[in-house]
UniProtKB/Swiss-Prot annotation:
Similarity field: Belongs to the cytochrome b family.
Keyword Electron transport: yes
Organism (species): Liasis olivaceus (Olive python)
Residues spanning the membrane: 25-45, 69-90, 105-125, 170-190, 218-238, 280-300, 312-332, 339-358
Name of this protein: Cytochrome b
GO molecular function: metal ion binding; ubiquinol-cytochrome-c reductase activity
């Protein structure tokens, strides 16, 4: 094999022999990114960023453009696949202590924030009823910022309400941000290769490493093939599974939907926002639900890196997973009992996981040192 630096980046990269299937999601995310950029380009060619024509242009893409329905569905459902993969990728990082590779973790969370911003801007583009109202509610949170809030919101909207300038700038941002994601992904991979991947046992992998290609690259192909198969099955047979019925109607600023909610991948943060009966408090909790991930490298106190041999941390981790799913479910429901109470309890449990990491680590160290 020729010793070229690009081949060294991927092919000759030494990787621990014992990394499991949970390490496959990085390559799956890269595949999702390529798919989103390609389908997004073909959609942008036919899309019109104008409030009178945006909805009609989506209908035109779906009905008249050859394979337009496939591009549109692949792009929409591909975004959901992207978020499924990234949430599993982050969960694996939390479970196996990958966050101790600080630079890689920080670049990864920055990637998540950029991806969420890109997805939000993209959700507005079809100019459906739910697109319009979700954008109104989420961007309106900026008004909670003391002193600067109203000016910031007006600046973002390009006027005193969401209108044509808002759609134009959201389209521009949705087009440019994927290139920032590509740059950040490259940085993420470079930083990862600087220190090397962790492994399920949390041991020093230097004693037992093999080349990434052909061993791990072929292992990655299995889940990659399953993901693509799953994606095409949904696109072909259940294309509207993640869509909101309200979004099949053109945006009408005079009619408010009965229940405003963003796409499912934002619902955990939206559920935390709704659980606090105060605008500024809710906005801060929403930001904190993502930003708290930045703290994990600094709150790790356990002697062992992964949770593989730490039962207390495992219990809290699986509580976090079930909490995440419960908040997402509760956020799809109306703001009424018992869903308000469920959202509040699960929001508290969500933050408890991150606050309990140092205490549990200290307790586990004590338990292990006890003869």
């Amino acid at each position: 094999m020729p010793h070229h630096y690009i081949l060294t980046l991927f092919g000759l990269l030494p990787v621990a022999t014992n990394i499991s299937t949970w390490w496959n999601f990085g390559s799956m995310l890269l595949t999702c990114l390529v798919l989103q950029v390609l389908t997004g380009f073909f959609l942008a060619v036919h899309y019109t960023a104008n409030i009178n024509l945006a909805f009609s242009s989506i209908v035109h893409i779906t009905r008249d453009v050859p394979y337009g329905w496939m591009m549109q569905n692949l792009h929409a459902i591909g975004a959901s696949m992207f978020f499924i993969c990234i949430y599993i990728h982050i969960a694996r990082g939390l479970y196996y202590g990958s966050y101790l590779n600080k630079e890689t973790w920080m670049s990864g969370i920055t990637l998540l924030i950029t991806l969420m911003a890109t997805a939000l801007f993209g959700y507005v583009l079809p100019w459906g009823q739910m697109s319009f109202w979700a954008a109104t509610v989420i961007t309106n949170l900026l008004t909670a910022v003391p002193y600067l809030g109203t000016s910031l919101t007006t600046w973002l909207w390009g006027g005193f309400a969401i209108n044509d300038p808002t759609l134009t700038r959201f389209f521009a941002l949705h087009f440019i941000l994927p290139f920032a994601i590509i740059s950040l992904s490259s940085l993420h991979i470079i930083l990862l290769h600087e220190e090397g991947s962790s492994n399920p046992l949390g041991t020093n992998p230097d004693i037992d490493k093999i080349p990434f290609h052909p061993y791990h690259s072929h292992k990655d192909l299995l889940l990659l093939t399953l993901m693509m198969m799953f994606l095409f099955i949904i696109v072909s047979f259940f294309p509207d599974i993640f869509n909101d019925p309200d979004n099949f109607s053109k945006a009408n600023p005079l009619v408010t939907p009965q229940h405003i909610k963003p796409e499912w991948y934002f619902l955990f943060a939206y559920g935390i926002l709704r659980s606090i009966p105060n605008k500024l408090g809710g906005a801060l909790a929403l930001v904190a639900s993502i930003m708290i991930l930045f703290t994990t490298p600094f709150t790790h106190t356990a002697n062992l890196r992964p949770m593989t041999f730490r039962p207390l941390s495992q219990l809290m981790f699986w509580t976090l997973v079930s909490t995440f799913i419960t908040i997402t479910w509760a956020a799809t429901k109306p703001v009424e009992p018992p869903f308000i109470a469920i959202s509040q309890v699960t929001s508290m449990l969500y933050f408890t996981f991150f606050l309990s990491i140092p205490i549990l680590g200290w307790m586990e160290n004590k338990m292990m040192n006890t003869p």
